[in-house]
Amino acid sequence: MTAAIRTQRAGSWWFPGICLVLTGWCANQYVSLIGWYQQHRELSEVAAFLVLASYVVGLLPMLVFAGSWADRLGRKPFTLLALIASIGGSVLLMLGAQAEMWLHAGRVLTGVGMGLAMVAATSWIKEVSPGASGAVRAGLCTSLGFAVGPVISGALVGATWNPELAYLVHAITAAAWLVLIAFQPGTPRREPVQQAVQGTSAQGLKIFNRLVLPMAPWVFGLATSGFAVVPALTGRGAGASLLFSTITVAVTMGLGALIQPFARRWDRPGTARLLVIGLLTAITTYLVMIPVALTGSTALGLVASVLAGCANGILLLGGLGQVLALAGPGEVGKLTGRFYSVCYIGFLIPTLLSLWRLFADPLYFILLLGVLCVLSLVCVLSNRTLLAVPKMQPVKSGS
């Protein structure tokens, strides 16, 4: 490979990478405004978290189906669609000032854009990145988008008391990048026969199902625990100040992004080290949340957000790294979609907590999360030896 080609390959990952940042920005821009909507748009806690969770309605179908489409038809068309959906999501959120249903519609379309980006843009980055750097780049861009979105929206709303302005800023920025990326070359589409030959091995699927999926819900489970559960436990859930909400999101998602370059150094090929470290950090997070639930301490809550962010970043890097290493070249999008679809189970934790609080003490909800996290760790430790088994021949794409 010539130096010119290497330079082109190294530089081109920025185009889908920025798409992940922009769709992640859109996905989380509502997060820091949850308390603001409760205070100034008179949404109940349950209603505000249902708006947050409605995002999953648009996201999951894209994660389940769009990966295979992108594997066959190429990454670029679906990356462009991701940006278009993300722009549409921000536009619909702007209409939320008129009726709550537009908030739900905007969040659903935002989920469509994020789901498309997660499978198509992540796979695009993988294809133009050498070695294991694809997972680091994709994970970092995703986390960076999740971090900057709520900070920008929180800052703009804090200064103007106008969330519609925050959504407009995102829509304009994403539209500008859409025009730019439209003129960049994409990855080639794969023929059905080629895709079948380049499928994931049976051993790879076994590792994915037994080792990766059990830890996947905690990737975003820890993220939402840090920026949504912590304000609820400190007594600031329904009346959380915009500043406190923005800080918890910035701390959680910011550390999720910042820790990934360091966590990469802790990894060892052929091991589940990052998954174990991430789950141990997650368990520690929920241990710290126990006194937060008992005392409502803001200081301890911020410590929990720090730990949650670290766990999120480590688990995202470790899980995505395993997925991209296991997936056959013709099924990168498909396996990535499966991984993220399970990751987003954790996104429902704040909504479940808001419903739990109607009937029981939130302390027991935190204890339950901790126990489930321990069970995931046991599952990972029990199956980590599968990584030592050589990968066999790929199975057909339809499996």
Model feature map: region roles:
Residues 165-182, 365-384:
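Symmetry-related core transmembrane helices of the 12-TM Major Facilitator Superfamily/SLC fold
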Residues 50-67, 118, 250-262:
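Central cavity-lining transmembrane alpha-helices of secondary-active solute carriers
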Residues 245-268, 278, 282:
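Transmembrane alpha-helices of Major Facilitator/SLC transporters
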Residues 131, 136-185:
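Helix-loop-helix hairpin linking two adjacent transmembrane segments in secondary transporters
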